[in-house]
């Protein structure tokens, strides 16, 4: 059994539903683990928190992590494995495809605290002799994300707008590159790393395929015969400062574990379209 922290979030809830017989959902108000295998999803999800609550990323991504590590250590000493969900945001602007060994140069509060959390985790685990794994996720999409917006799960948000015939704005002619993976495939990849991955190691989780927003939204428009029009706009200054324009991941290590993606990007978009219709 694996104790899942952050089981009510978009990815965490999908993971728990997919592997229901093997998970213990940890209440958000407690840090007490119920098994020696830990899967940790708790995190903020955007760099924009700095405008409303600059302490949120630090408190959530660092303080809560330390509290959880302490609870696990006090209960199990060093006899547990901590699987930490991180993000491609830690890379910042990087040579592509980004490898686990690539240098990290994050700029935003969220991105910086995710990298700091990785380093804190490694230091803590090495200090106490605890096993860990770090999983850096690509852009995760799929139906069921009630908080999707231009800043989070933008693919679902934009696809929804196109299906409904609304005009959309695309940064840089929609040519920004991202690595998208359906949430169910992401959960399968996470489970693959947990069961087959080396301990004390880092893994990229993604499709390994570069896609841009213009081509994907054009597919949605053609598929639904939408009247939506696309307008190219200049990204806000803050977006250009904290966000890499292009990103996709090298998933060689994930493939070596035997993982194979099951849902193509077009199949995932078709699912979104069907849900909206």
Q: Residue ranges of each PLM-predicted region?
A:
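N-terminal Rossmann NAD(P)H-binding glycine-rich loop of SDR-like oxidoreductase domains
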Residues: 1-20
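NAD(P)H-binding glycine-rich loop region in Rossmannoid oxidoreductase-like domains
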Residues: 31-60
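Conserved catalytic-core motifs of eukaryotic protein kinase domains, centered on the activation segment
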Residues: 48-56, 93-97, 146-147
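Conserved Rossmann-fold NAD(P)-dependent oxidoreductase catalytic core, especially the SDR/UDP-sugar
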Residues: 66-109, 133
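Conserved beta-loop-beta element that borders a ligand/cofactor-binding pocket
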Residues: 86-87, 119-144, 169
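Flexible, glycine-rich beta-alpha linker
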Residues: 91-92, 108-109, 133-153
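Active-site helix of classical SDR
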Residues: 113-116
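C-terminal substrate-binding subdomain of Rossmann-fold SDR/epimerase-dehydratase oxidoreductases
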Residues: 162-277
